Amino acid sequence: MRGRILLGAALLFGLLGNLSETSAGVSNSLLDVSADGTLIACSNRDNGTVTIIERSGRKVLHEIPVGAKPEGISFLGQSHQLAVAVYADDRVVWLDADQGTRLAETPLFDEPYGVVCNAAGTRLYVTQEYPGTVAEIDAQTRQVMREIPAGSMPRGIALDEAHHRLYVTEYLTAAIVAVDLESGKVVDRWQGPSSENLARQLVLHPTRPKAYVPHIRSRVNVHQGEGSVLPFVSVADLDSKEERRRKTLPMDSFVGAFVVANPWESAISPDGKTLVSVFAGTDDGFVAEVLDDNYRELSFRRVLRLGHNPRAVKFSPDGSECYIYNALDFDLVIYDTESFNRRGQVRVCESPLSEEQLLGKRLFYSALEPMVGRRWISCASCHPDGDPDGRTWQNPEGLRNTMTLFGMAWTHPIHWSADRDEVQDFEHTIRGPLMQGQGLVRGAVHDSLGTPNSGRSADLDALAVYSNSHKFTLSPHARDGLSAAAQRGRELFQSAETRCAECHSGPFFTDSRPEKPFRLHDVGTGTEDATEKLGPKYDTPSLLGIYRSAPYLHHGKAATLEEVLTRFNHDDKHGKTSHLNPDQIADLVQFLKALPFEEPEPAAKSAKLTKVEK
C-alpha cells in the first residue's frame, strides 16, 4: 500500500513538475513568468520597454528599453533570460532579467508578434504577421534557422512539444493553423465563419487536446452596435476527426445580458481547471471553470472588474496567482486563484503619453459610456492600434473598406468620400446607430464639413489627438533600398504615360489635402456597388504601407495589387495600365510594396503640407 502511495505521489510530482517546466512561454502573451516562479516579465507597448518584477516582493527590479512597440515575451526554458518581439522594429531582443540588460538582437523580416520557447530553452518560435511565417530561432546562436509558412497574418502561437506541433492563429480570420515542426508544413486547420476576426492569441489545455482562442466576429452587413461586432472564445478539439471540431462560445451572453467587448487574451491554469479571459473594450475579465464535457466547455465563475484596456493575463507556474496587465493604467494586478480577490498591484512603468493623448487612447478603446451605449463595440474594434480590420463594411453610404489611421494627420479629409474634415466629426458616429453613446459634446453636433466640432470638448479633442498620432513604419521590401524591379516600377509610376503620380503624389502618395474644395476622383469603381450613395468620386488614399493592407479600393473587391492595376482599372480611369505587359505590372507592384522606403514626414514639412494634430 505504501508503495502505491509513493508511486502515485511520484507520478503526481512528475506531472506537476512537467507543468511547471512548460508553463513559461507555452502560449504567447504580453506577460510571462519564469519557470521557477520568481520573476514576472511585462511587455510595455507604449513605452517600448520590458519590466521585470520580483514576484515575492511585488516590486519592479528593472525596466529595460527594447524598441518600438514590443509585443510577445517569453522566458527561455528554466533560465532568467528573455526574448521579446519588437513589432515596429522588426526584431527579437534578448534580455537578461537578473541584470536588467540587453544581450543581443535578431533582425527579422517584418512585424514579429507572438513568441514561445521550448522547455529546454534552445528554440524560439516567433510569428511574423507579414509575410505570414513563423521564424524558428536557435536560442544559443540567436540565428534564424528557418522560416515556416503559417497562414495569413499569424499572431497567436502556442507550442505542443509532446506532438512536435505549433498552433498559430490567423489574425484576420481567427483560424487555427497546425504546423508540424519536423516537416515545417501546415498539417491541419480549424476554420470558423468568415466573420471571425482579430485573433491575437491562443492557449492550449495542459492535459487535454483543446485550444482556446479569444476573438471577435465582424458582421459587416450590420451597422448597428448591438449586432455588428461580437466577442467570442472558440474552443478547438485538436484530436477530433469529426466535421465539427470547433465550438464558438459567445461572451456577450456568457453571463446573462452582461456584454463585454474586444477580447484580447486568455490564460488557463496549470491544472487545466480555470480559464480567465480579458476584454479590452469594457475593462472586464471572466473567470470560468473548464469543463471536461466536449459540449458546454466553460462554466461561468465570476466577473473581474479591471483597469483601463486589459491586454494580458497569465497564471503563476504553481497556479496560486493570476496576473492581469492593464495596458492604459500601466500596471499589473495580482489575484489569488482560490477566490480571485486582489492580492496586490504593481506599477510597471510611467505613461509615455501626454495626458491628452492618454485620454484620447482610453476613449478610442472604450466600449463604455459616454463613447458607447450598449458595450459591444469601440473605435478599436475596427481600427485596432490604428490598423484596419481587413473588412469591407456595408455602411449606409455603400460598401466601405476599413482604412488605416496611419498618416491620417497628413491626409485629411477623412473617409473614402471625404465626408468628414476632422476627427471631431466622429461625434456623429459616437451618438449614431453604430455606437449609440451619450457623446462627448454638450448640445447638438455641428454638421460634418460645416462649423467645426473641434474646440467644443476636451474629450473629443483628445480623441482626435490620439487618432491623428499614428505613423507609418518603413516597408521591409526596401530595407536595403529599392530593388531593380522596384526601380523600374518607380519609373513607370512616375511616367506621364501611366499618370499614377498625378493623384498619388507627394511624400504620402496622395493629393488629399484639408484645404477646400477637396480633390475627389472618379477612378471607375463607383458603379460597381449598387448600394453606393456618395460616389462615384473618391478621396485619394495614401499608398504607404499598402503592401500589408489588402483588400483594396473603396469597395474592397480587389484582393491584390495586381487586380487594382488590371481587373479593376476600367477604361484606364485609375491610371493608364492596359498597355503594360505582365512583367511591367509586376515591377509596378514591387514599387508599391516598397512604400514607404523613406520617412515621409520630413518631406511633408519641407513641402509645407498641412498636418492636423487635433
Walk through the language-model features, giving the residues of each.
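Short coil/turn segments that connect the beta-strands within blades of beta-propeller domains
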Residues: 36-38, 78-80, 120-122, 162-164, ...
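Periplasmic c-type cytochrome electron-transfer domains
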Residues: 24, 160, 174, 198-225, ...
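A short beta-strand motif characteristic of beta-propeller blades
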Residues: 59-64, 101-106, 143-148, 185-191, ...
